[in-house]
């Protein structure tokens, strides 16, 4: 990707973003540790779509810092965006910060450690910087274009890289860890989103060759309760496959930046008409994502070929999901 911002300036923005993520994470940690009073939260769309005062306070901290340091940059945050209720894709060619102040709010309200702050920096629709900080785990995932992806700024991602990054299994999705989320749409209706997801989960988990040939027999199915953390763990190499629909750009911008810089692949969750055709990179605002961990070569394939083979095998087993963006409001 040719970035119009010089590398030296990108490096400065990256250092600022990592420092800001740590400060925001410290505020999250202070709030989650304050368990003397009951957590106060409001429901957005339903009982599993929550927002706390902490979400808004952390976003305010991040937004103020960014607008002070980089007043010419655009800012898109989950909570300020949600209040507008436009649901339009607002990212353009301009340098844009895309922020989720607290991804995994349900986890946060239960003091389950899989929650984080997510800060992405986007230029020409491409995430060039990503920082994810999970304060209860003290895990900082970060990347800058052309600088690699890192855990706690010391260990390069993916973590397993000696003697080389392992290829994906020849029988993938068998022998893989598959991550997915239940999502906010819990309507129990025939062929609804929940039913399609469950069918896809079972297809991936069932013994090989079962379910009309769709059984994938993955090693395990994981649901971390945070799409951002799913992506971070895919970049780390701990998750092999992440499949999801319903996310917004602030959920994935930082994670996609980190995964791509680590050598991963991100494409659309829904299979195209011709699954043997070229695999296109995902559109940031598509709301449908399939991510594959970084992979090295096998004796017969390049790392990219093992990733693309895995993508096609997932597509053969999952249902189409419908998460179109709402129409423009007048």
From Swiss-Prot:
PROSITE patterns: IMP_1, IMP_2. CDD domains: IMPase. Substrate binds at residues 78, 102-105, 251. Mg(2+) 1 binds at residues 78, 100, 102. Keywords: Magnesium, Metal-binding, Quinate metabolism. InterPro entries: IMPase (IPR033942), Inositol_monoP_metal-BS (IPR020583), Inositol_monophosphatase-like (IPR000760), Inositol_monophosphatase_CS (IPR020550). GO terms for biological process: inositol metabolic process; phosphatidylinositol phosphate biosynthetic process; quinate metabolic process; signal transduction. Mg(2+) 2 binds at residues 100, 103, 251. Pfam families: Inositol_P. GO terms for molecular function: inositol monophosphate 1-phosphatase activity; metal ion binding. Belongs to the inositol monophosphatase superfamily. Not known. Probably involved in quinate metabolism. This is Protein qutG. The gene is qutG.
């Amino acid at each position: 990707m040719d970035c119009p911002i010089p590398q030296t300036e990108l490096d400065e923005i990256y250092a600022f973003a990592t420092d800001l993520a740590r400060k925001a994470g410290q505020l999250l940690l202070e709030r989650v540790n304050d368990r003397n009073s009951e957590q106060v939260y409001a429901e957005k769309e339903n009982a599993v779509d929550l927002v706390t005062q902490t979400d808004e306070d952390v976003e305010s901290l991040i937004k103020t810092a960014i607008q002070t340091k980089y007043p010419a940059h655009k800012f898109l945050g989950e909570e300020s965006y949600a209040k507008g209720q436009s649901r339009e894709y607002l990212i353009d060619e301009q340098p844009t910060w895309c922020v989720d102040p607290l991804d995994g709010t349900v986890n946060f309200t239960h003091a389950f450690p899989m929650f984080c702050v997510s800060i992405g920096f986007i230029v020409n629709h491409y995430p060039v910087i990503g920082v994810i900080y999970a304060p209860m785990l003290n895990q900082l995932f970060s990347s800058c274009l052309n600088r690699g992806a890192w855990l706690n700024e010391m260990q390069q991602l993916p973590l397993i890289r000696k003697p080389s990054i392992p290829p994906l299994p020849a029988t993938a999705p068998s022998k893989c860890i598959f991550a997915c989320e239940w999502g906010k749409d819990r309507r129990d209706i025939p062929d609804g989103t929940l039913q399609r997801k469950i069918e896809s989960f079972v297809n991936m988990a069932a013994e090989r060759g079962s379910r009309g040939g769709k059984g994938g027999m993955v090693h395990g199915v994981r649901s971390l309760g945070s799409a951002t953390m799913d992506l971070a763990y895919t970049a780390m190499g701990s998750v092999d496959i992440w499949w999801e629909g319903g996310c917004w750009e602030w959920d994935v911008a930082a994670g996609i930046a980190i995964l791509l810089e680590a050598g991963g692949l991100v494409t659309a969750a829904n299979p195209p008409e011709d699954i043997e055709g070229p695999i296109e990179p995902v559109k940031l605002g598509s709301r449908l994502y399939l991510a594959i961990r970084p992979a090295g070569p096998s004796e017969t394939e390049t790392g990219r070929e093992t990733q693309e083979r895995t993508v096609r095998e997932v597509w053969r087993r999952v249902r189409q999901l419908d998460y179109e963006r709402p129409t423009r409001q007048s």
